[in-house]
C-alpha cells in the first residue's frame, strides 16, 4: 500500500476548519455562501475518510507495539489481530485514495441527454424510445427531473431523435458512461419468421452548461423562427414558436419546438447549444485524460459499441468491462441500471488510481 502524504491530509483538515468558521460567522454574501456550502459538503466526506484512515493507522501502530512486548500472550494476541487490523487500515486507505482522486468539474451538473436511432430502421427508432423510458424511470428513482426538449418521432413509434434535459445534482456523474452505441437484439413484432434482428441507437450525455461556464456571442448566432410541426410535417400551431439556432463558428444547429412559447423554446435551445459547446471545449482541454480513459474503460464515443441488450436471452452485456447481467427487464425499467453504472464508476476509479500511481 502506498502511503498518503500526511501534509496533504493536514491541508484538507485546515481548509475544512476555515470553511466551517467562515460559514458560522455568517459574513459570506449569498453567492459565496452557496459555493462554500457546496465545498463544505464535499469536504465533510473527505474529512470523515481522513479520520477513519488515521484511526485505523493508530490501531495498527498499537498492535505493532504489542508485538514488541515481552508478554508472550500479548504478542500472540497481537499477531492474531494484526491481519484484520491491517485489512481495515488498507480498506480505509483505499476509500480515502478514491476521495482524493481528481474530480471531474462537471460531475455535479445536470445533463443534456441525446438519443438517436442508428442502423435498423423502425426497430432502431423503437429501441431509442425504450432507452428514453429507461433513463426516465432511472431519473425518477434518483429524484431527478427529466423533460424532453426536442423530438423527431419514428413512423412506427419511438424516436428517430430525441433530446431531453435531466436536472438534479450529480446527474452527469451517473449518466456520463452511457455515451456510446447501444445495440439491441430481438424479434420485431412484424417479423413472421421469428428471426432475431440487430438494431442500434446512439446516446450522448453532455454536462449542462450555465452562462458562467460558456460564453456565447450573440453575433455568432443565426436564429430562425417557424411554425411548429407535428408528425407528417403538418403545422400544429399558427404562431412561429419553433426555434432553430445555428452557431456559425462551430456549425452546431439546435432545433426546439416542444413549447408553445417562442421564448421558452429559445431558452431551451440555448441550453442545448451551451451544453454542446461546453462539451466541445471540455473535449479539447481534456484530450490527454480522455485518451487515458479510452485505454481503461472505453471512451464513450458515439461510434463505439458499449452495450448489447439481448431480448431472447434476457441479458444485458456492457462490453467495456465485460459485465453481463441476466436482468434485461430490470435494467430497462431503470431498477437495475445502477448495477452497471456502479461497476463502470469502480472501473473508472481504478484507472484513475493507476494513473496517479496509487493503484
Curated annotation (Swiss-Prot):
<keyword id="KW-0488">Methylation</keyword>
<dbReference type="InterPro" id="IPR005139">
    <property type="entry name" value="PCRF"/>
</dbReference>
<dbReference type="InterPro" id="IPR004373">
    <property type="entry name" value="RF-1"/>
</dbReference>
<comment type="similarity">
    <text>Belongs to the prokaryotic/mitochondrial release factor family.</text>
</comment>
<dbReference type="InterPro" id="IPR045853">
    <property type="entry name" value="Pep_chain_release_fac_I_sf"/>
</dbReference>
<dbReference type="Pfam" id="PF00472">
    <property type="entry name" value="RF-1"/>
</dbReference>
<dbReference type="GO" id="GO:0005737">
    <property type="term" value="C:cytoplasm"/>
</dbReference>
<comment type="function">
    <text>Peptide chain release factor 1 directs the termination of translation in response to the peptide chain termination codons UAG and UAA.</text>
</comment>
<protein>
    <recommendedName>
        <fullName>Peptide chain release factor 1</fullName>
    </recommendedName>
</protein>
<feature type="region of interest" description="Disordered">
    <location>
        <begin position="283"/>
        <end position="305"/>
    </location>
</feature>
<keyword id="KW-0648">Protein biosynthesis</keyword>
<dbReference type="Pfam" id="PF03462">
    <property type="entry name" value="PCRF"/>
</dbReference>
<dbReference type="InterPro" id="IPR000352">
    <property type="entry name" value="Pep_chain_release_fac_I"/>
</dbReference>
<dbReference type="GO" id="GO:0016149">
    <property type="term" value="F:translation release factor activity, codon specific"/>
</dbReference>
<dbReference type="InterPro" id="IPR050057">
    <property type="entry name" value="Prokaryotic/Mito_RF"/>
</dbReference>
<feature type="modified residue" description="N5-methylglutamine">
    <location>
        <position position="234"/>
    </location>
</feature>
<keyword id="KW-0963">Cytoplasm</keyword>
Amino acid at each position: 500500500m502506498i502511503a498518503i502524504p500526511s501534509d496533504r491530509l493536514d491541508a484538507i483538515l485546515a481548509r475544512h476548519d476555515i470553511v466551517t468558521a467562515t460559514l458560522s460567522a455568517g459574513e459570506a454574501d449569498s453567492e459565496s455562501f452557496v459555493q462554500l456550502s457546496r465545498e463544505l459538503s464535499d469536504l465533510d466526506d473527505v474529512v470523515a475518510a481522513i479520520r477513519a484512515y488515521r484511526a485505523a493507522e493508530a490501531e495498527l501502530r498499537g498492535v505493532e507495539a504489542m508485538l514488541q512486548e515481552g508478554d508472550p500472550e500479548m504478542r500472540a494476541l497481537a499477531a492474531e489481530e494484526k491481519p484484520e487490523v491491517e485489512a481495515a487500515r488498507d480498506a480505509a486507505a483505499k476509500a480515502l485514495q478514491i476521495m482524493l482522486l481528481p474530480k471531474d468539474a462537471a460531475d455535479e451538473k445536470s445533463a443534456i441527454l441525446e438519443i438517436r436511432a442508428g442502423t435498423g430502421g423502425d426497430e432502431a427508432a423503437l429501441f431509442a424510445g425504450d432507452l428514453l423510458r429507461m433513463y426516465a424511470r432511472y431519473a425518477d428513482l434518483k429524484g431527478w427531473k427529466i423533460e424532453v426538449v426536442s423530438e423527431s418521432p419514428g413512423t412506427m413509434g419511438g424516436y428517430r431523435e430525441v433530446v431531453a434535459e435531466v436536472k438534479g445534482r450529480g446527474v452527469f456523474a451517473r449518466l456520463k458512461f452511457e455515451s456510446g452505441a447501444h445495440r439491441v437484439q430481438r424479434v420485431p413484432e412484424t417479423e413472421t419468421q421469428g428471426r432475431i434482428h440487430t438494431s442500434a441507437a446512439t446516446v450522448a450525455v453532455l454536462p449542462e452548461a450555465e452562462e458562467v461556464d460558456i460564453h456565447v456571442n450573440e453575433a455568432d448566432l443565426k436564429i430562425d423562427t417557424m411554425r411548429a410541426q407535428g408528425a407528417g410535417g403538418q403545422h400544429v400551431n399558427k404562431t412561429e414558436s419553433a426555434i432553430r439556432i445555428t452557431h456559425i463558428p462551430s456549425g452546431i444547429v439546435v432545433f426546439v419546438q416542444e413549447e408553445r412559447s417562442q421564448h421558452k423554446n429559445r431558452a431551451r435551445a440555448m441550453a442545448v447549444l451551451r451544453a454542446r459547446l461546453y462539451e466541445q471545449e471540455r473535449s479539447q482541454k481534456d484530450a490527454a485524460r480522455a485518451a487515458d480513459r479510452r485505454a481503461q474503460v472505453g471512451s464513450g464515443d458515439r461510434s463505439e459499441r458499449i452495450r448489447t441488450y439481448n431480448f431472447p436471452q434476457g441479458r444485458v452485456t456492457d462490453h467495456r468491462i465485460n459485465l453481463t447481467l441476466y436482468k434485461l427487464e430490470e435494467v430497462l425499467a431503470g431498477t437495475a441500471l445502477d448495477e452497471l453504472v456502479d461497476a463502470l464508476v469502480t472501473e473508472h476509479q481504478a484507472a484513475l488510481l493507476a494513473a496517479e500511481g496509487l493503484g
